[in-house]
């Protein structure tokens, strides 16, 4: 079954509206004008409870909003209303320490001793909160000093338990009972000893607290002090026990029992509407003789020493409290700053390490690619030069040709080749730089999560190389097709000339063998051949194959075969002049074609297409000059080899995508990009120096040219060089006649065709292997890049963790600074407390000095004590007389009351009689009776005034001392009779 309060709360909670919420909000904001407006215009009730059990009126008392509380009281708010917890506004104001609100409520006729749901009064709340001003205000409004809550605790017990020394002193001065006990038998002194407050213990001992009182367990205050372990408290208790004497102890016990009985009786009667008795003065211990006075002086000196010691201890404690927070704060701040610096340093080191690792990875990648390219270039160049310069000729007569091979022109050719190798190395370096730029671009793109773009550059390069390879193959096919058409154009002539030349060589074989030696013939023709070679070089013959050398070789064959050396020389000179003029024109045309092309690929196309035409022009020129069919067939064979070697060089160039491909093409002697080397010219010079007058010398020279061309062509490490060498040796050894290769160009072309197909297959295989290697390198590079990216992400995560740690350290530093500020505030509060304690000590010193000055001699004290005893005896006699006179006065008062009633009835009767005629005798009798009664009333009034004056005198005496309960009852009756008399009048 619900209680009435619960129902009331539920009803009010249901009626709670927005206006009530606005009023509550205005009180929270302490908006006095808003509160007044809402109450006046809306008609709101300030004491209405919300669903949580609080109202605007109670909130104003709790928050200390004195202005809002004044407005609500002016609007007629119920002062005695309680909130959901059972507190009224007076309890809340005392609990939260708002003396202004407390004064307003007390002036508004709020009951000062009303209890809350736990039995606490406003003084209990003020004692628990330690509010000295609120306690003084309640004492000034005659609050009961010894009310008990449900646990039997009084305000003094609560103040002692909370160690509020000043509040205990105030309550003792206002007459609070020192030795009252709660339901557990504990006194204020026991709780002060338990709380460890020597100041509170000292105040209670000075107020008359007894050490012999025990609690429900039989433990006294000394036991509580021993449990605390405070030496100062134990010293105070021992001194108080030693100082107390039996007479004084009995007197204190009597006074304590009387005060306890009075407090209990007053607590039992506090519900009755009776007047409050006068407050009891604090008990004091009288000094019976000089010995007690001497002991008092000694005690005061000891107390002074204790106070000085306490002052020094407080000063030391203050200094220690002042230094400890500063040192702790400084150490914590230094440690936090050091941590922040370490974290920042670690962060900088991690960033530097990340940057250095990134740079190292990039440098290693670039260096690796550079070293690989340089290794390939160097190994290829060294192998090429070793194959070109280190191999010795294997054919007969090589020893005779060696001194002539080491000519100044050959050294110049080697120097030019070295310069070209250096130029190609520089170009290779530039290409490597471009590749490095492309790799950096790919790395930047990969960081933007576009990994697909990393394959763009290699795929484009691969497609371009494939297209270039297909184009070169088409050029090679066209060149072969044009050559076949050229060969098919003169089959009878070639065949006929072949048979004629072969027959002539067969007929004149003995003459050739018996003729001059090979060195002599070489010496005869070397000067002319060298001259022709120098003219070809001066004429800008870069990019042209050694057709001129073949012409100069084939030209002296017919004159020498005829046996007339002089005639042969003349004819040779004439034919060389014609051939030189014709070839000069062809070379000029070729040079103009090479200069007109700016791009390397275009130059390659031009060189590939013009070469067969040039071969045809050369054949026509030689035919017009009167050359034989044998010379033409030799040129055609040379042209076939030229075309095959050129196509092979183009294929090799298509395979090589780096700077090595240029080196291969230049070493073989095929320059279709506009940069023509003189390697083939060197071969032509070698061929020219090896010309013989007989068919055997021509065959050996052709064989040497074939071997040299095959050696220069097969520069790839795929075994093509060995294949060409074996093919040449097979042709040389398998031919019974040394001139068979010259006389059968169709078979040589077929052999070259097969050789070229073999080389093409080898180059395609090398291309596929190169593609696989490039793909593997690309995958490895991607793996390295992925590892570097993962490492970068790991470092990024570490960096983020370090940043978070730095933020945490910064926040910790901020909290430490905040705590330091709070510690400073606490230090300031402690300093203020110390200052307050210092002022208290000064006041104690002044009081001590005043007590010293107020001490009187023992005789004067004895005389004053006897005078006081006589005065007490007289007062007791006067009180007994007053009681007797009071009884008499009470009877007289009742008589006066009866007489007053009779006078009143007589007056009424007179009024009635005045309206009706009566006899004169009756009228006179009545008048005489009235006069007598008036005189009697005057006499009684004089006596009553004397009684009242005596009562006032005794009341003044009672204010200064103790008034008994019976005297108080008599005085109450007298006052009641006075009120009745006033009403009767």
UniProtKB/Swiss-Prot annotation:
The keyword Secreted does not apply. Residues 311-326, 349-360 have a biased composition (Basic and acidic residues). GO terms for biological process: auditory receptor cell stereocilium organization; sensory perception of sound. Expressed in vestibular hair bundles. InterPro entries: Ankyrin_rpt, Ankyrin_rpt-contain_sf, RAI14/UACA. Keywords: ANK repeat, Cell membrane, Cell projection, Coiled coil, Membrane, Repeat. Disruption phenotype: Deficient mice exhibit progressive hearing loss. Loss of Ankrd24 induces morphological changes in hair bundles, early postnatal hair bundles are warped. Stereocilia of deficient mice show diminished recovery of auditory function after noise damage and increased susceptibility to overstimulation of the hair bund. Residues 291-488 form a coiled coil. Residues 243-293, 311-360, 386-412, 476-503, 594-614 are annotated as: Disordered. Its main location: membrane. One of its GO terms (cellular component) is plasma membrane. One of its GO terms (molecular function) is actin binding. It is found in: Cell membrane; Cell projection, Stereocilium. Pfam families: Ank, Ank_2, Ank_3. ANK repeats lie at residues 52-81, 85-114, 118-147, 151-180, 184-213. Homodimer. Interacts (via C-terminal domain) with TRIOBP (via C-terminal domain) isoform 4; recruits TRIOBP isoform 4 to stereocilia rootlets. This is Ankyrin repeat domain-containing protein 24. It comes from Mus musculus (Mouse).
